[in-house]
Regions:
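Short, conserved glycine- and acidic-residue-centered signature motifs
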Residues: 135
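Flexible ATP-lid and adjacent glycine-rich G1/G2 motifs of the Bergerat
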Residues: 142
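Conserved GNAT acetyl-CoA-binding A-motif
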Residues: 148-157
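Conserved catalytic-core motifs of GNAT/GCN5-like acyltransferases
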Residues: 157, 175-189
């Protein structure tokens, strides 16, 4: 907590000398050793993503997500069609370099340049991406880009019952900050949101 006080003796927050709001994330390609983070392109990525997602025959990957499962490629493509035009969320595809195939999607969302805060979300990792270096590196590349732009805080929120997502957040260096009860309705269910953050030093 702050040890600074104002002229009234009230505790106040730390000053941010020279603070300027960062630019919004742009549609650019982020290149790593195992993967590329590419702006979502329906014509280029839809079929590859659908095929990768379809390896989850039971549909387990969709349990805690707002979309899916999808019964056909046409249904998935129709859901995907408007996403590339969105500015917030700003969608990307995760491409496995070894396979040369899109294997997952994610987005920057709740983009708040004025306060230097951005959230990563809409994460849909196919079985080809789950628990692989591609998953770790894709999240690293997105986080790195946000901090390079000058964002002070990078957030990850998930269903409080999603143990896998909570473990992934902890492994990536996020810190648990609290639970938001009755925060969201997801697929007709009440969703308790598990909030974590990865604040920068300034």
């Amino acid at each position: 907590m702050s040890e600074r006080t104002n002229s009234f003796g009230q505790p106040i927050g730390r000053e941010l000398p020279g603070w300027l709001p960062p630019p919004r994330p742009s549609r650019r390609v982020l290149v790593g050793r195992f993967c590329r983070v590419e702006p979502l392109d329906v014509a280029r990525h839809a079929r590859e993503l659908y095929d990768a997602n379809s390896l989850d025959a039971e549909g387990r990957m969709w349990t805690y997500l707002f979309s899916g499962p999808f019964g056909s490629f046409e249904e998935y493509r129709a859901w995907l069609e408007p996403r590339p035009a969105s500015e917030d969320p700003l969608f990307f595809a995760f491409v496995d370099e070894r396979r040369a195939q899109a294997v997952g999607t994610g987005a920057y969302m709740r983009i708040d340049p004025a306060n230097g805060v951005v959230e990563v979300g809409h994460l849909a990792f196919s079985p080809l991406m789950q628990r692989t270096p591609v998953a770790t590196e894709a999240m690293y590349l997105m986080m790195k880009y946000a901090f390079e732009l000058g964002y002070r805080r990078y957030e990850w929120k998930c269903d409080a019952l999603n143990a896998g997502s909570r473990r992934a957040a902890a492994r990536l260096g996020f810190t648990f900050e609290g639970v938001f009860r009755q925060a969201v309705v997801c697929q007709g269910r009440s969703r308790v949101v598990f909030g974590v953050g990865n604040p920068r030093a300034r």
